[in-house]
Amino acid sequence: MADLNKLAEDIVGLTLLEAQELKTILKDKYGIEPAAGGAVMMAGPAAGAAAPAEEEKTEFDVVLTDAGANKINVIKEVRAITGLGLKEAKDLVEAGGKVKEAVAKADAEAMKKKLEEAGAKVELK
C-alpha cells in the first residue's frame, strides 16, 4: 500500500511537461487513452473544480434568518409551506433556521418571495 501512496504522490507532483510525457508513454506503449479532461487535469487545484459545482446547484435550503416585525404573517406562511402545526411553526419562526430543505430552485425562490412579503428575511443556501 505504501508503494501506491508513493506513486500517487509522484503523479500529483509532476510538472505539466512531465505529465504530458507520461500521457504520451501511456498512449504509445500501453494503448491507454486519457478520459475526457484527462488524468493530467485531475492534478489541478481543487478550487477550480469546486466553482462549476456551485453553478450547477439545483437544490436549495430555504433558511429563515429573521422573522421581522410581523411574526404572525410569517408564521402563517411557514405553516402553509411546511404543513407544520401552529406551535411548531411559531417555534421555527422564533428560532430561525431551515424552513425547507433540498427544494428546487424555482420553488425555493417562490417560498423566499412569499416569506419576504410576509416580512421575514430569508436566505437560499
Swiss-Prot record:
Protein name: Large ribosomal subunit protein bL12
Protein source organism: Cereibacter sphaeroides (strain ATCC 17023 / DSM 158 / JCM 6121 / CCUG 31486 / LMG 2827 / NBRC 12203 / NCIMB 8253 / ATH 2.4.1.)
Job description of the protein: Forms part of the ribosomal stalk which helps the ribosome interact with GTP-bound translation factors. Is thus essential for accurate translation.
HAMAP family in the record: Ribosomal_bL12
Source organism superkingdom: Bacteria
Family: Belongs to the bacterial ribosomal protein bL12 family.
GO process terms (BP): translation
UniProt entry tagged with the keyword Chloroplast: no
